[in-house]
């Protein structure tokens, strides 16, 4: 599969259709806004701080994480294949004065053009939306410098993840639009780690992300059965 084929146009269309509401704190992307501080803290902690680090956000969408990392002093580039989310991200960057470079380009192509460039690479909630997640993981590894910090987050392929992310979040609680996720595309941590190790990455830490529907609060913990985040180091 070439890099230009590793795009699910139906997935892109889902996010294009609602891109204008990316920064609406009570809209379809409310869960992303709510988990962002937890993701950001995890990344900042594992990297020892982001200040002045060349940082790439793969699958950046409307720029929620990208802009948060830039506010911490990182030199951030965000790449995505959705034009509307990138347009929203650029406008929000102009409105807030937070400097992020946004580019529409496949990760594989960008990796061939910028190998071993970045100190930090993030790829959050993207792998479950592409036809070939292993290809993205290899591109991310290629983009990272030796010793760089690399982060992936996605959904575990478990019955609990189906129950919580699709039945609960989509159908019952209406937290995200119905059809956002496909359980067949969820990825077990062992599979993600295997792909990452093949690409020259070494796992360093993991965390689970849980939602309490009673308190309506998210938390990081050791339960990786639904949402999880993995931290890797690029080997020399």
From Swiss-Prot:
Reaction(s) catalysed (UniProt annotation): a 3-demethylubiquinol + S-adenosyl-L-methionine = a ubiquinol + S-adenosyl-L-homocysteine + H(+); a 3-(all-trans-polyprenyl)benzene-1,2-diol + S-adenosyl-L-methionine = a 2-methoxy-6-(all-trans-polyprenyl)phenol + S-adenosyl-L-homocysteine + H(+)
UniProt entry tagged with the keyword Electron transport: no
Record family assignment: Belongs to the methyltransferase superfamily. UbiG/COQ3 family.
NCBIfam families linked: UbiG
Binding-site positions, S-adenosyl-L-methionine: 39, 59, 80, 124
Alphabetized Pfam families for the sequence: Methyltransf_23
Gene: ubiG
GO process terms (BP): methylation
Transferase is among the record's keywords: yes
Alphabetical UniProt keywords: Methyltransferase, S-adenosyl-L-methionine, Transferase, Ubiquinone biosynthesis
Pathway stated in the Swiss-Prot or TrEMBL entry: Cofactor biosynthesis; ubiquinone biosynthesis
A GO MF label: polyprenyldihydroxybenzoate methyltransferase activity
Described function: O-methyltransferase that catalyzes the 2 O-methylation steps in the ubiquinone biosynthetic pathway.
Entry EC number(s): 2.1.1.222, 2.1.1.64
Protein name: Ubiquinone biosynthesis O-methyltransferase
Superkingdom assignment: Bacteria
Gene3D superfamilies: Vaccinia Virus protein VP39
